[in-house]
Structure formats: structure tokens, C-alpha cells
Amino acid sequence: MINYSERSAKGHLMVVFHERCLTPYYTSTVECPARVKTIYSKLQDRFPVVRPTPAELNDIQRVHSPEMVARVRAEGYDTYETALTAVGSAVMASEEAVRGYPAFALVRPPGHHAGPEDYRGFCFFNNIAVAIAALIANGVIASVLVIDLDLHNGDGTENIFLGNPAVRVVNISADTRSAYLNSLAQALSKAGNFDLLAVSAGFDTYVHDWGGTLITEDYQAIGNMLRTVAQQACQSRCFAVLEGGYYLPDLGENVLAFCEGLAGR
């Protein structure tokens, strides 16, 4: 891992990663350790990397019921501990963001399909929602814009923050490259001001993945768009958390392109 002080030498964006996310817990074969391994191989020499600690139970229970937490624990030690570590990564990335530094949480399992009472879609705990809820509960921020870039709507995130005026969740979707980028641009132009920009960064919209839409260069453009809006609206307070993305040959390059855009390269 790279020392925290090396940030300026290796890039403005911080990557948060823990090797526990490589654990082969029981899940779908497409949501495999090779996903984060190939991404890490592309990011490790381009950005500083920090190692998180697992999330605390009280943070998890701000957004998930005790009964749901118990069900995740019953999935087995590897699943539960890896899920806690993924949440801890998102929490650390969000803490970087409120200091004005962009951060990317390289995690598995993903989280945006995990709601208050249930979980599905390869998700167990809602990584990004726990991080946001902790910042709000501690009085660090008062308003958040969540942009979900994944092919599938972040229904868990929507359900967690349903009726909460402090958090606005926007899912981006379209059938073509130009329509997708235009949809994102329009959503950002209408967003107004907020204290933090949080991004559920899914890459299954890729042309060779399930979504069959975007190319690698588009992810850099998306990162740039998000960085620009964060600079204008919330003093560069922006973090992203990995969600989907399953086409292994190009997944690392796609995430690298996104991170370079978010870092302003």
C-alpha cells in the first residue's frame, strides 16, 4: 500500500481498498474476486491507496434493520466480514470527500440493491448509503446528491432515503451513448447546490457488458463531468463506490478511465 502522504505525487484521487474484498465468499459466479483484482492492477500505480477498517455495527444499523443484519451474518463469516469491510471502504472514501479530495472505494460486494429490510443483486449492505447516513448523523453534511451510474437502478439506496429531503437519488439510464451522457449532463445541470456528491459507479453499461452501451472513453468523460459539478456545487466533495461491471477484459481500463476523469487528468 502507498503511504497517505504520497497523495500529491501519485494523483489527486485516493483509492480505498482492502484485500479482504478478494475473499471468494458464496455469491454469483459473475461477482467474483477477479473483478476487483483486475481493477486494482490498473489503479495501484496511478493513485495512492489506503487500507480501510471494517464498518461499525451501529453505522450499519442506521440504514438496515437488526433482522436484516442478522440474515447477512448468517450467510457465513467470509460474507459478513467482507461486507463490513466494503462498507468501511465507502465510509473512508466519504471522509476523504468531505475534506475536499475525491476518492474511489474499490469494493465487493456491491451495495446499491440492499434496502432497509432486504438485500439482493449480489449486494448485502448498502455501502454508499451507510457512508452518507453516518456523515448526516454526525452533522458533517446536510444535503447529498447521489448519482447512480449502474445499468440497474439503485433501488436499495432509493428505499433507504425515501422521504428524506436531505438525500436526492438520481439513476442514469439510456439506450445509446449520446443519450446516456446527455441524461447525466441534464441531471447534473438541474441538481443545484448540495454538500456532497456521492456516486454509485457501475460499469455494466459497457458496450461488451450487459448494458451494451458505453465505451472506455465515455467513463473518463463521466468522471470529468462529475468532478466539474462537484467543484461548482460542493467544494469538490465527491466520492464514488464500485457497484456493477462484469466484463473482465476491459473492466480495469474502464474504472481507470473513470478515476482519471474524476481526478482531473
Indicate residue ranges for each PLM-predicted region.
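N-terminal low-complexity, Ser/Thr- and acidic-residue-enriched intrinsically disordered segments
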Residues: 2-61
